[in-house]
Amino acid sequence: MKYLLILLILNSFTLLSHTEDKSHASAQWQIDAYGSAAPDFIGNYATIIGGNGEILHKGTNGWTCSSANARPFPEMGWSSAHEAMPFCLDENSMKFMNH
């Protein structure tokens, strides 16, 4: 019984410490990271532009999210969402930025 209890405790630590190993250059990581610059009700429905300028997610609410980091997009992606410096703009802000 003691061994079973120890096994269950060790297994629970393993389950709790599991982190999803997602490449920071993947489309899904970029969608999650860049969309996090706005509240969920905006970021979840925004168009997401990836590090290479490609549209990764076509939004439905007129907002656009991307990385504001001016350095070239790293081959392995940004090390964190903080390093990517995500931002989100609505349609009018995008027009202002493009002029």
Can you name each region flagged by the protein language model?
Residues 20-99:
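Primary mode marks residue(s) on the alpha4-beta5-alpha5 output face of response regulator receiver
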Residues 3-12:
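Sec-dependent N-terminal signal peptides
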Residues 12-21:
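Bacterial Sec-dependent signal peptides at the C-terminal "C-region" and cleavage site
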